[in-house]
Amino acid sequence: MIFTLKLFKKLFRNRNERILVHMKKIVDMINYMEKDMEKLNDNQLSNKTNEFRMQIKSGINIEELLPQAFAVVRESVKRIFNIRLFDVQMLGGIVLNNRCIAEMRTGEGKTLTATLPAYLNALTGKGVHIVTVNNYLAHRDATYNQPLFEFLGLNVGINLPGQTVCAKKIAYESDITYGTNNEYGFDYLRDNMVFNVKEQVQRELHYALIDEVDSILIDEARTPLIISGPSDDASLSYLKINELVCNIIKRNIDHCKYPEKEEYFTVDEKSRQVVLTEIGLILIEKLLIESGMMGMGESLYSSDNIILLHHVNSALRAHILFACEVDYIVKNGEILIIDEHTGRVMPGRRWSDGLHQAIEAKERVRIQNENQTLASITFQNYFRLYEKLSGMTGTASTESFEFKSIYKLDTVVIPTNQPMIRIDFPDVIYMTEIEKINAIVSDIKDCVNRKQPVLVGTVSIDKSEIISRALKKEGILHKVLNAKIHAAEADIIAQAGYPGAVTIATNMAGRGTDIVLGGNWRSEIAALRNANTHAMLRIKSDWKERHDSVLKSGGLHVIGTERHESRRIDNQLRGRSGRQGDAGSSRFYLSMEDSLIRIFASNKLVDLMKRMGMKSGESIEHPWITKAIAHAQKKVESRNFDIRKQLLEYDDVANDQRRVIYEQRNKLLAMLDVSEVIHNIRYDVVDRILNIYIPLEIIENKKDLIKLEKCLKDDFNLVLSFSEQLDEDTSLYEGKEKIRVCILTEMIKQYKCVKEMVGINVMNAIEKGIILKTFDALWKEHLASMDYLRQGIHLRGYAQKDPKQEYKKESFSMFKKMLDHLQYEIISEISKLQKLNRSN
């Protein structure tokens, strides 16, 4: 029977196992070459890079070089770091080179695994971008791996915010560049806004290897990168409406005391929307009229008051759905957004659609002007620009469908080097938040008493501080890691494995830094003023004792204080324990007051808990509860996936247009002489003008010519009198072509006159400047129009129309009009040069 089962499993392996079986054959080839590499001296080993490059130039594909190149990297790592890369790391490297997502557990050595495909793809000379979630990790990984890459004859660059154009160019020209997803994306947008090709820093996007790929391509997918400029000041409107909304909220609280009274607004926490009821609309309109912001008898839903409606909705959302210390913090008179997935502050990022200004009014800090979008792109569309893309993370399998459907990336789960022995206890659920916190504190106390380190994961700063206060009350020493102390997070998380240490971390703060059982001895050595051999040996000996005592106590114990909306985030928290076969454990404590259960859990679970008549302090621990919570999480994940997919479908429309604009702009930027382009545009513009004012081949009305003359004078500085000539030359009635030739002749004559006055080189510079400025100005206006269209397009659904199809159709029409207007404005601005020259 056992033999039959083994045979069945062998015949019907799952897809992941089949991929790994094939890749293990390549690993065997790499292992076979290991002894040959050991025989090479340092010069011979590092010279392999030049040999590989020569082979690539002769036409050999890099895939053919993979086994030998990986064997070279393994031997080099051994000599530089005194570490032998495991076979599972080789598997990870092969997966990453194959345009896939590699799921590698925490502590399996992802940083060094990335060096394998990075080295191989850098041999092409086209550049490799290694993408991290923050600047600390980019700098850390680049600094750590630099000796290895330099030994192999490759140079390493670091792309950081605030660098000069020159420094960024050096970073991007390097064989391997480390940087954050934000910085790569912003550099792309900035490159498409420059007026001189020498100011562009990026080269063609060849290969991107994304660390923590789930965080970047999924968690941050809903937030586009935006370069913006200030628009009109509307701070007074936000302040006034903030007062009115505070009034409504106060009245609503009073209304709630009487169940028979209708509320002024309804709240949908699932979709994060606040909607005015009928009586709420009547009240806000009354208050707006009394404040003088709206005229008597006007409706808030009229087209004249659409901006007021927008402000009211933003203020309601700011007060009801967004909380300080959860969604944002107030620091130095500024509202700083907290990343809901990592708990980190995101400086420089602002909510759009007036929400940020509404929160500034709510918190009574200085209201900054609303921003107008100058350029934007989503991470989804930016990373799809790369010729080759791959990524790695500790948790990807739950999102494998999304990686495949949106990015065309398969997910491969890499086995651990040592068996995973962490114990994941079932969830414990309490009726109230207070009971849950008491149970968490009790669990922490037990761990501290037996010197077991504890990592407590929370979903917000507010929750982390509630736990912190409860621990202080009990006299339990602990460290808090949240958005407020971002700078120290790596040091705090590195020492979270110290015997009896208690660390409270917001979500996945400190991600990317391993928790070493017994504490991080390397940081202790780094802190020594006189790092002599005796002191180093003493530190290592002390660490060994601590490490062994932590293992005896059960390893790192992870406590989740609440289930996250995504199972993947929960798995990331659990994954901090049990690294490299270490002992460890995890447990989640829940309450019926938790957001996930309150909003998304099924009514069956809620009813069951109520029927059981649990007493104060009692809890339920059952696998069925864990399954019910997982089901609720799947519902949320499905909803969030739909939101991201919809965002991509809409952004794909803008992306197609963005590519056209940026491609044309870059062609013009690279041209030394754009006069031929101007010449062709001039013909198109004149044809378009004639089709507007003289739609038929013959002139039917003298008034048409008068309108044409006015247009030519106002927009093109041309004084022509076709209407007067008509009395003398009746052939003009049938001479549309004659008029066309006349206009073009005068325009060209005018153009040549200016060119002679300023010189060819100056004229080229002026023309290019006009084209680029016009491109940017109209693209900015078009983006604003697209935003307005997008915000209201869902209303088409009420007319039985598909909003997505309507958006595609209308945006295409808007884009075509914008391109026509672009040509018109370019010729208009160039024609006005003579007028400017005369005035000088």
From Swiss-Prot:
Its main location: membrane. ATP binds at residues 89, 107-111, 514. It is found in: Cell inner membrane; Cytoplasm. It is a peripheral membrane protein. GO terms for cellular component: cell envelope Sec protein transport complex; cytosol; plasma membrane. HAMAP family: SecA (MF_01382). This is Protein translocase subunit SecA. It comes from Blochmanniella floridana.
